[in-house]
Structures are given as structure tokens and as C-alpha cells.
């Protein structure tokens, strides 16, 4: 059944969040701060390992880099477009709207937790690749694995950052179902190279999310999102 993978992913995020809420109320503030740093380290390593998979190759027994030009152009042009549109502002507005609608207007951490968790779970290689596989073949195994990882990570995030991270299931559902639908409709454009490049830059953005978890406010990750689409488009130009 096409789209089932995202439904499972959403369910696991909600389950992990509820566990985080249950345990979080018994944690001291120092432990919550430490868990937030741990979340950042985990996300950093996930992003780094994903990017290295596409950046480094072994040729004739030696380690070489691949695709640096595509990565540089995608990140620079994507950042310029993102800053002009100011996606960070609009995602913050959406986060504030969700906060108000869910009765959490008094929670100062809600929007930051919502944005951070949403970006962590939507721009990664597993989400993109898994949604495309779901759309093309109905295979949801990658999204099932992603859901398990998301559930563990969101449990830590909710424990340390609050319930805003729980509602990340909304953009996760919207984004992954859209990718699944697009993959089902535009299958010829979903070439292996396009998917690899999209996943490559997406992993770099995951790394940036980890930086923001450890050093909040240093990177406006949402304004870098156009880089993902630039990477896919450049596949057919470079």
C-alpha cells in the first residue's frame, strides 16, 4: 500500500514522544540539558555519516572526494534563495500557529523544539529515499527503519526540549506523503543520480541541525532547504 511507510513513521514518532513526555517530567534540568547535547551529537553523526557516504569513494585503492562542485553550488545558491524568501521566518510562524492551536502558547521552548525536530526528521536521506521507494514500488522498509530511529531520537528531544518536538509528525507526514506522491507521478525524473545528490545535500543539512542543537541560533537551517532541490536540479545540468 503506497503511503503506508509514512503512516508507520508518524505512529512511531508519536509513540516515542509520549515516552519522552512520560520520562521527562521526572528528569532534573541538568539531565535535560545533557540530553539535548547528546541529541545534537547523535544528529551530527547521522548527518556526517550520510554525507560521507556520497562524498568519499575508493578508486584504485585510494580515498577520493566526489561531487564537491555540485555540493558547493547547491549550498551557496540554495542559501541565497532561502535567505531571500526567509523560509526560517515562515516556518517559525507555522510553529507558532501550531503552538497556539494546540494550547501550548505558554511554552517558550515549543517553537524551537518543533522546528528542530521537524528539520531533523524531514531533510535526511532516509526520509527522502524511503518516501521515493514507497511511491515507486510500495516498499516501506526504509521508512520503517527511519521511524524506529526517529522514535528513539524524538524521545530524547521531547525529554529535554519539551512537547514541541512531538508535533514534528505534522511536517513529516506532509513532506513524506508529498515526496511519495511526486515519485509515483514523476517516476522518470527520479534517477539514481538525482536521488543520491538530493540525499547527499540533505545529509549535510542534518549535520547543520546537529550544530543548531548544540549551539542554538548559529545556523538558520530552514533557509538552507532550497539547497536540496538545487542538488536534484543540478543532476541534469552538471
Question: Positions of the model-derived regions?
Answer:
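Membrane-interface helix termini and inter-helical loops of multi-pass transporters
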Residues: 53-65, 129-134, 183-192
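A generic, lipid-embedded transmembrane alpha helix
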Residues: 39-55
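Cytoplasmic-side transmembrane-helix entry/capping segments in multi-pass membrane proteins
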Residues: 31-41, 96, 165-175, 222-228
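Alpha-helical transmembrane segments in multi-pass membrane proteins
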Residues: 8-16, 20, 24, 40-41, ...
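Intrinsically disordered, low-complexity non-transmembrane regions of multi-pass membrane transporters
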Residues: 1, 29-30, 87-113
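Structural signature of hydrophobic alpha-helical transmembrane segments
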Residues: 2-15, 66-73, 131, 135-147, ...
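Interfacial loop-to-transmembrane junctions
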Residues: 210-229
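Helix-loop-helix junctions within the multi-pass membrane cores of secondary transporters/permeases
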Residues: 99, 108-185
